[in-house]
């Protein structure tokens, strides 16, 4: 049964409709139709651009807007989900089952539940205020966030910019709360930089080491140089940058052969002390200093589309925090922890904060959210809309 978008349980019904679309990235399977069908009767103009990139599947996206004047508040999110996995679910991952006060399904937390709350809050706001509310509301919803994210928000924003669309602030509905709704607003994200380090040696028999050059001691030496000293001590809103080695490999199954190369991969999550360029220069400096003339190496730093960024705690952040406090009684922490999100693209268009449901079970078997949290998050988004567009 289609959701009654104006019922008290509209967020739950919309979330169920979305979950019942098995939109494992990059498939849509009707998920964006659910969004469009909710917004179109309220007067939103709907666009459905599909973006392409060689080597990647074409991906549908949705842009919706009501109003052309005044400040524009954007709700952003994604309707694609990760695969359901191989574990046994207590409930069908694409049924949207409710049991013991919990909504189960892939995407319940990340982030079909958040999208549903945005939709329900906006429709209720328009019911209260009508179309002449003193501004504009837009939706940026992609089907390419859980995948490579090349045909999603980054291209949708460029498409909107070329059409002359302008935005003032954005709420991205990612599941930001660790354990309780209202705990945390994300006001920024760390950057991400991946490096591939290769130390060059000369293959030979282990019984004749003088005729070979073992690259493994050199790799250990260079790896130690990267982690011996902290990259920084952290900043006002960010923890210290962190470098982690993720793979080490010599490609050598033989026990009597000295390998010709030794490779390691690492990833750095970095704060706003650095850009990808300045961090790359520091990494190379440390390696060259440690290598001297004794170790031959190559370094491949993968281009990063995830710089560190911060949305300064200003009046908009305060507005959202006050809406959360009014509904939950909690004062949210302003955080920059966690991985990357599409906020890294949105921050170039307008200030962006992230606030959504509890993410404790996202990407897990039996992903679920509390039905009561869907209602509370809808109310929080409603308070944000009322405060952002106070009217006369």
Curated annotation (Swiss-Prot):
Its EC number is 3.5.1.18. Pfam families: M20_dimer (PF07687), Peptidase_M20 (PF01546). Transmembrane segments: none annotated. The keyword Zinc applies. Binds 2 Zn(2+) or Co(2+) ions per subunit. Zn(2+) 1 binds at residues 78, 110, 174. Catalyzes the hydrolysis of N-succinyl-L,L-diaminopimelic acid (SDAP), forming succinate and LL-2,6-diaminopimelate (DAP), an intermediate involved in the bacterial biosynthesis of lysine and meso-diaminopimelic acid, an essential component of bacterial cell walls. Belongs to the peptidase M20A family. DapE subfamily. This is Succinyl-diaminopimelate desuccinylase. It comes from Methylobacterium radiotolerans (strain ATCC 27329 / DSM 1819 / JCM 2831 / NBRC 15690 / NCIMB 10815 / 0-1). The gene is dapE.
């Amino acid at each position: 049964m289609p959701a009654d978008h104006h019922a008290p349980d509209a967020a739950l019904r919309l979330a169920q409709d979305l979950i019942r679309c098995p939109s494992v990235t990059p498939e849509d399977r009707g998920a964006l139709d659910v969004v469009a069908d909710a917004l179109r009767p309220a007067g939103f103009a709907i666009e459905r651009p599909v973006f392409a990139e060689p080597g990647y599947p074409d991906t549908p996206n949705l842009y919706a807007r009501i109003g052309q004047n005044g400040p524009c508040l954007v709700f952003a999110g994604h309707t694609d989900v990760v695969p359901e996995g191989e574990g046994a679910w207590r409930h069908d991952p694409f049924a949207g089952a409710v049991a013991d006060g919990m909504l189960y399904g892939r995407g319940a937390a990340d982030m079909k539940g958040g999208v549903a709350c945005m939709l329900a809050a906006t429709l209720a706001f328009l019911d209260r205020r009508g179309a002449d509310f003193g501004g504009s509301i837009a939706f940026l919803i992609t089907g390419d966030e859980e995948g490579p994210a090349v045909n999603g928000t980054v291209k949708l924003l460029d498409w909107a910019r070329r059409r002359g669309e302008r935005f003032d602030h954005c709420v991205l509905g990612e599941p930001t709360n660790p354990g309780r709704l209202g705990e945390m607003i994300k006001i920024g994200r760390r950057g991400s930089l991946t490096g591939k380090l290769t130390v060059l040696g000369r293959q030979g028999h282990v019984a004749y080491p003088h005729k070979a050059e073992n690259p493994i001691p050199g790799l250990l030496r260079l790896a130690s140089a990267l982690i011996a000293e902290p990259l920084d001590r952290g900043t006002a809103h960010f923890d210290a940058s962190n470098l982690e080695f993720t793979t080490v490999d010599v490609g050598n199954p033989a026990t009597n052969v000295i390998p010709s190369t030794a490779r390691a991969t690492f990833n750095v999550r970095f704060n706003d002390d650095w850009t990808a360029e300045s961090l790359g220069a520091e990494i190379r400096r440390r390696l060259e200093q440690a290598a001297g003339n004794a170790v031959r190496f190559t370094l491949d730093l993968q281009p990063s589309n995830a710089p560190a960024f911060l949305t300064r705690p200003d009046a908009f952040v305060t507005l959202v925090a006050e809406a959360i406090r009014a509904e939950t009684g909690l004062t949210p922490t302003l955080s920059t922890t966690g991985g990357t999100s599409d906020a890294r693209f949105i921050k170039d268009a307008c200030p962006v904060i992230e606030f959504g449901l509890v993410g404790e079970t996202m990407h897990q078997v039996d992903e679920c959210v509390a039905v009561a949290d869907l209602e509370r998050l809808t109310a929080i988004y409603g308070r944000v809309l009322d405060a952002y567009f106070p009217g006369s």
